[in-house]
């Protein structure tokens, strides 16, 4: 009973995997225009839950180091805007107005260091989904067992019992390959803005 709740990354995995199943089921049943919208929203969601959350976590680590040494709101804001500029590179002009955006993100106050769970959980779900697409119904018992385990085992141990090595770059690459395939599918729709 004390370990029945799934750890944060696995909780994110369950919901994301279900969304992937729904998306996969709908993608062949919708119109071209609906597919453009759905794919655009999917890519936006992948960015927000993987990349943006990863950069939030990087910012949190840096900020906590700053706080330990004594810092100011201005210094934290500089760290945040540098983080945004690194995140977007030269693809987007990041206004200095965003320097204070960090102060409006409730996770930083209410659930510190939660944001990694979005990145981890989403990439884990994407990697598992890629396996599901390869293995089909043979994957289902493993997936149900992973969900049923809740928080009774550490994610790396639980997943290893089902043949998934989350310490392997190859495993995570499967999730990133899914993201890449969605971006390519979107580009193939010849959408111009």
Q: Model regions: which residues?
A:
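Short beta-alpha connecting loops at secondary-structure transitions
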Residues: 1-6, 38-45, 64, 68
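C-terminal, non-catalytic "cap/extension" segments appended to globular domains
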Residues: 3, 17-29, 33, 49-193
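Post-HEXXH active-site segment of zinc metalloproteases
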Residues: 1-17
